[in-house]
């Protein structure tokens, strides 16, 4: 199994290293024969000797073309002859490429920016993560001492925790009497002990949570400060910290550094990405949070260190559990894309598509288009019409079916052969013309991207059939990871067409796909309403919610299934409408904002949730009660009564203070805040009193009654004393409770002022309150 590749230099020549695990053993294979190259298109082939004379300097050495050969390629499906220019060293390529491009005989150069080790994987057809090797994993985490205003890495590391499949332990340098804590004499000894643990356990995978941007950089800084050689690589090297966009990325040679943070950001949509929030979202179990100031206080006072050690150990355990959960999917993506898991786990979906296409292009002898320069990038900036949205029908509705297209955009790309190489191509016998935008796509041959996408969808269907047939739970799970990886990739192709930095960028393709998408969903709505008596309540891009006013549940379900049998034969190619679900009741507010309840009583909301930290418990609780009243009981008036009751209790100071606490996270150094929100104001006052505040600290506060700015009236939650303080009832009504329910009840004709007990009485809203869709 290939874990990763890189190259080193021996006697001025590049040597590819392939890090592998075979038969349970780690090994490094070397290849000294692979040469760096790129392609050049010439106006006149006779100029090649002149081009070979172009030189550049790199570190005082003259760089030039080592040799050249003429090759037959295809560019966007059309035959083309180009020159393949070879060089002595990968670093020669960036040194000389602009000079060769500037030569009068050169039309353009291609594939000059593909990193050497990645090029090797592509050209040799090697697939990382392929095979059945059992990889060993170790997760680790650090706790540090931080004071406001200190430079990063100044404070000591207090604890290093680690976990694998057999144990979870903490190393520290203060006396803590717990069975899983190893106590050493100094910070230096602690770091050296941890490095020894890694060498002895020799894991194939190191798992961190934001290790790219924190743990490794902090360890490196402390190692430099304390004179420790920070060797973690299997070749004896130190971790390599490099910039990747606006973040950092850390490589450990011979081991896969699996940072969960970018993976989870790409995979799960959460209001906050603390380790605690992620763990609860994934496993449904809470994890205690010990804040930075609590760690500092415990360390400096010596009291409560057991709690900090337990927290540190749990950090490592939780990171290990999350790593085991997410690693198999990333391994499948790595196999599918054909690049290392280290790269794939840090890639956007657009980059995943691009690396997949680069590998397939090489296999099909296609020359990859160049990435855009700044001028071209500016030209590409600009939008196009998206998916169709039908504005929602207001009110409360019963017996709702949800129908949607299976893989709408991938199906359109394949069905209509939407691809840069088929776009407006002259001399074709047959074209598909996109509605509204009028772009033509040749149907005489399968386009590069549609054919690849077709293969992917076909493979996914085969895997799903295998999943149904197998009785082995492990095989079923692995197949599921594979089909999900394919789904992620396949669903990213449409977005890739419109991605301005893409090599195979094609705005005409992207806007044609959405134009066909609009045509098909509008046609489905028309047929559903006119021929089957449905009322479409809301539609968005590839799916719709609909009911038959006055019909019971069984009738609605039966008619929906009859409609699918009627409509699917009318849809071209791979397009297929599916029955996705049935809901007992629901309401639709605006675009992408609705709530429905299924037959098991499960409420699903979209765009209405308030799960961010900066909502108090009273706001969350009120919204949940309002949704339950409307969806479970079908009673909008009850929902309004709940809101009035809560606002009344707030006004009369009858709500317990624990329900009023607002939590907000400090995301940067306090001195970097321009605007001072309530949490920042509280944090600054705490810092002035000696409390340690750093990025990541969560401030919990309550807003008091009074005049002046909110920030001046916010106090730490644990300082609130009901005998001395009064909360600001008006603030909680206007900024917490009403915003949490206002957009829901607005769908039934209520205004904000209708929801307060002390304001105007309820006016005639019978038309809104009547449950629609009933007999």
Curated annotation (Swiss-Prot):
Key words, A-Z: DNA replication, DNA-binding, DNA-directed DNA polymerase, Nucleotidyltransferase, Transferase
Identify the Gene3D superfamilies for this entry: DNA polymerase family B, C-terminal domain, DNA Polymerase, chain B, domain 1, Helix hairpin bin, Palm domain of DNA polymerase, Ribonuclease H-like superfamily/Ribonuclease H
Whether Transferase counts among this entry's keywords is yes
Presence of keyword Phosphoprotein: no
Q: What class of enzyme is it?
A: transferase
Please state the Enzyme Commission number of this protein: 2.7.7.7
* Substrates-to-products reaction catalysed: DNA(n) + a 2'-deoxyribonucleoside 5'-triphosphate = DNA(n+1) + diphosphate
Q: Which GO terms describe its biological process?
A: DNA-templated DNA replication
| A GO molecular-function descriptor | nucleotide binding
PROSITE patterns (alphabetical):
DNA_POLYMERASE_B
Q: Which SMART domains match?
A: POLBc
Cited InterPro entries: DNA-dir_DNA_pol_B, DNA-dir_DNA_pol_B_CS, DNA-dir_DNA_pol_B_exonuc, DNA-dir_DNA_pol_B_multi_dom, DNA/RNA_pol_sf, DNA_pol_B_thumb, DNA_pol_palm_dom_sf, DNA_pol_type-B
So what family is this one in? Belongs to the DNA polymerase type-B family.
Name it: DNA polymerase
